[in-house]
Amino acid sequence: MNKPIYPSVLLIYTGGTIGMIENPETGALEAFNFDQLIENVPELKRFNYRIDSYQFTPPIDSSDMEPSLWSKLVKIIYDNYSKYDGFVILHGTDTMAFTASALSFMLEDLSKPVILTGSQLPIGK
């Protein structure tokens, strides 16, 4: 019997609170290791998707987002376009609207979804 082929999504973490996790010893927020996404967000196991991740290292404070980083996002998407059915960009909320606007022009001819999202709370909260 063949294994089912699930849709695949590339999760791109640029920075922002959504990609932080609380250090249990200090209570401080630290950058989350997205290689451990499924272990830390077990709800994702309910979906029939393959989720891979790419992280900006170090994470970008969204107030520092600029056109060169928009170009980097576009390159990541184009370099991985044939491997994934869609892309989710995790972004800081301060400048997400600017990035979304820029990417809407830079990626206007794509036939796959690109979703931007952020949060005021860290991942898993």
Task: Please report, for each region that a protein language model flagged, where it lies by residue.
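Active-site histidine-anchored catalytic micro-motif
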Residues: 1-125
